[in-house]
Amino acid sequence: MLTWKLLGLLVLCLCAGGISGNGDPSPGSTDTHEEEDSPPLPLGPPIPGDPWPGAPPLFDEPPPPGSNRPWRDLPDSGAWPPKPPSTDPPKPPLPDDPWPAGTQPPENPWPPAPEMDHESQEEPDLDPPQEEYR
């Protein structure tokens, strides 16, 4: 079974031209033809305005004026040019009312803070003296 697969692979390579039938171990002559058919490289600096030899044009020729260009067919809706923004004075912002209806919350819902002494206080000793252990 393996020999039939190998034989089929060999026939496929021969038909595709991957193996030359004349037994010549040198590479095929198709590589040299490609190099000979390519245009010669320019001999010197490029001339401004002349296209690079062998380079295809980047863009097609523009269509003649007056031809149908769908991107230029804008509807006559009067939307162009756009209207400038209105010059009305800005309106004051509406007050944020989290309680639109019902009973209103008290003015200050927080309890009063405890009274504090604003006199100078001694800071606590963060590093108390240690007793010596013997």
Curated annotation (Swiss-Prot):
Signal peptide: 1-21
Positions with biased composition (Acidic residues): 122-134
Cysteines paired by S-S bonds: none
Residue ranges of the region described as Disordered: 18-134
Pfam families membership: SPR1
GO cellular-component term (any): extracellular region
Bias (Pro residues): 39-67, 81-98
Protein keywords: Secreted, Signal
Name of the molecule in the record: Psoriasis susceptibility 1 candidate gene 2 protein homolog
Species for this entry: Mus musculus
Lineage, opening ranks: Eukaryota, Metazoa, Chordata, Craniata, Vertebrata
The encoding gene: Psors1c2
